[in-house]
Amino acid sequence: VAEGVIGGSPTSGPLPGSPGLDKPIYTISVAAEILETHPRTLMMYENIGLVVPQRTSTNRRRFSQRDIYKLQTIQSLTRQHGVNLTGVRYVLALLKALNDHGIPPPDALKDIDVSALKI
């Protein structure tokens, strides 16, 4: 997962004076650079419904900080935990359900904070 993400962390929230978590500020090329991945990968995630960036009036994608956090989580699940993309959708939904019911996640997934993600 890329380091040095601008705007705080999911648990600490945005830094003072920075845009909110849901403000669409990153173009696809900037988001890809932050995540150290190819823009086409982000387009694939969008096509299968894992992330839904907002669109400008000219139909250009804009990713929010919350989208970046979600994409980092997807990267963590696929790279560190070996989960395929179908499994990612299932794991995220399961983690959200556990979080909604106040149940802690399994030890292997404690590093994933779903509270800041829109799932």
Language-model features, listed with the residues they occupy:
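Short coil turns linking two alpha-helices in DNA-binding domains
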Residues: 38-40
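Arg/Lys-rich, alpha-helical DNA-contact motif
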Residues: 1-33, 43, 47, 52-53, ...
